[in-house]
């Protein structure tokens, strides 16, 4: 592992540290948004993060719950970073990372065994935004649906989450109609949607979705989140998430 490409930084103000690599996909505001969006209760015992990267979402969630958190990561370097991040934060008894394609889930998990499944997946289809297809394969896999597409992600999530369990997704707002159709295809009912805007003058860029497996019909559109003020600084609502 090339440590010249690595940096060790504080993870916001959450008394956590994270190792990142400049040639790999580093955590973004999306990871924080979905981590804060997830509804955690005393009945939440087991969580799965699909495409966990360097385990930033499990790290965030560990500050909010004592539930066991599992992450699946297909890229070896990201997997190794995830293990080290768990170790330096002394979370080896709470967070567990699996190095494999999540399509092989039956090797590791029982169907219907998770209270919550969540993901911050690749946002782009392979045929979209080809200018973002990077010479570095690891970045292409993180941004484009090279290894796992939206349909496969939601199908697998439906199999792994328990009946009436929760699925959380952060994705591009302009793919919302496709997401909602696919959720229903695999027996999820969307329950909450929150649109996120980079600034109040722009269209929504990101959407956060909560769905319940075999849930009742009834969708709430939550108040929007504006990420940046006009001067480019984070809004107070986002800054509170940093704490």
Model-derived regions, located:
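Mobile active-site "lid"/loop adjacent to the S-adenosyl-L-methionine
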Residues: 122-152
